[in-house]
Amino acid sequence: MPTDAITSSHTPTADGALTLPPQATDAGAENTGQPAEVVEHNLTFDGFRYTCRIARRGRLDTQPVVILGGSSQDRNSWQRHEKWLTPLSSVITVDLPGYGTADFLPAKYGVDFLAAAVRHVVRELGIPRINLVAACYGGAIGVRFAQHYPHLLERMMLVGMTTVIPADYAVAMERWDGMIRRGETEPIARELADRFMSPPGTGHVRKKAAVARLVYQQIASQNPEQLRMSAEHNSRLMRHEWYRPEPTPDIPGLVVTGEHDTLTTPAMGRTMAACLPTARFMTIEETDHLAPVERIADFADLVARFCTDRPLENLPYASEPEVFGTSRPA
């Protein structure tokens, strides 16, 4: 698939090839206060324009970290995590077709297409293998990517991922679809914010009020094109398989949920971990479905540890790892 255009902080190379930001020297890597270097590439896959963002600072201690966020996140949603991740490797975030600033994607294109778009990013950047961090809807894309393109994966971390869309959520999606198409942004923003956050009395969640306001404002302030994309996303969810029990590569896997996540519960996370050949399961304490936002530094630390094979035991912010996997001896 052709590259449509390149937007970069560097002058493009003569042949127009896509590149990662250059590797820093050891001395530069030690200066963690140094801002990350950022490059953005505008790409085209199967006729749809989309954008990837690459941030880099420091030595290459592990394979590039590709982050696939939820449907309401975009390539800029993970910038606050980069402080802890860019000293280790490049961090790549993507507005896939149908999301963020990318082209509108009709609902007939499902998870298979989006997984192929992730492969397109990896190939265009010339990366042999990646660490994949995939959250919520990004988790569905990430698992399908692993199933279809296993040779490109080194490790996979799933956040708030399940093998099935919760039944009550599936029913609510049909109602939300109508609300979005009627332009009822404030009611659906309130309902979605309540859905993503754990209900009162579930347990202490850090930054709960602030995160709830953020989610509400983000949804309520969507412009007409963003609302159109949101409606099409709901249609995509209803028309295509969320999870398909296909073979998954035997690579290190980690499944994570918030301790008080009531949307994708810890029990659902354990079921997901049990479907992978080699996986551990953990909860992040005092968080719910939006754990990556509620404990940014701790979540980033967990990603960094997993992607560099450091111990995950005895962490002050998470439960002890539980071992799952289809390749475990009986």
Indicate where each model-derived feature is located.
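Conserved alpha/beta-hydrolase "nucleophile elbow" surrounding the catalytic nucleophile
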Residues: 71, 134-139, 258
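Catalytic active-site module of serine/aspartate enzymes centered on a nucleophile-bearing elbow/loop
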Residues: 279-330
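Short helix immediately C-terminal to the catalytic nucleophile in hydrolase catalytic domains
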Residues: 142-146
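Flexible "cap/lid" loop of the alpha/beta hydrolase fold
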Residues: 147-148, 154-184
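Conserved serine/cysteine hydrolase catalytic core
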Residues: 224-274, 283
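Active-site loop/oxyanion-hole signature of alpha/beta-hydrolase fold enzymes
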Residues: 45-48, 53-55, 92-137, 301
